[in-house]
């Protein structure tokens, strides 16, 4: 674990807990510049109070209303990223995020970290299909560590039941059993 590499010009994409952790960790690992880009506005961030201020105090930058468009490579090596500015518009009584025409811009980057929230659509057994299970934040979206651990424990029981060919209906997990 002593051989940690982080680029000098780091770009983080995202606006949540993980993006803040990634940006601040990159700074602590020696990155000269860390810029975090979020496609929405400050009020839409999903972070703890004070996290943005902590990022800025550590010399990180947060740029709002911009999203990635393309990676820029030279001789098969990452050298930058092309982004485009975004804006929120009301269309048919619904707000939608759209790209601003001709607002593309490029910045240097030798390390890009995608810290974007994604959530899967699952059936009631936390399965994507008959043989793939998901657990924790990937299955539920951003939650607390305790919730992620609880969900992972429940899903691990379901995986065990599936592999051992036990009936899921007769394998109840009590809340008291979940730490």
What are these regions (language model features)?
Residues 172-179:
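Post-kinase regulatory C-tail/linker adjacent to protein kinase catalytic domains
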């Amino acid at each position: 674990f002593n051989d940690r590499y982080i680029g000098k010009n780091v770009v983080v994409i995202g606006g949540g807990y993980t993006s803040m952790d990634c940006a601040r960790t990159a700074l602590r690992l020696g990155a000269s510049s860390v810029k975090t880009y979020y496609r929405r506005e400050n009020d839409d961030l999903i972070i703890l109070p004070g996290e943005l201020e902590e990022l800025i105090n550590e010399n990180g930058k947060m740029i709002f209303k911009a999203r990635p468009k393309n990676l820029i490579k030279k001789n098969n090596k990452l050298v930058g990223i092309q982004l485009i500015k975004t804006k929120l518009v009301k269309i048919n009584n619904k707000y939608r995020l759209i790209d601003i025409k001709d607002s593309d811009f490029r910045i240097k980057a030798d390390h890009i970290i995608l810290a974007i929230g994604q959530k899967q659509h699952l059936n009631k057994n936390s399965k994507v299909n008959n043989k793939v299970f998901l657990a924790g934040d990937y299955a539920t979206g951003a939650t607390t560590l305790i919730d992620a651990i609880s969900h992972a424990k429940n899903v691990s029981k379901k995986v065990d039941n599936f592999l051992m060919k036990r009936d899921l209906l007769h394998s109840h997990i009590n809340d008291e059993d979940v730490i």
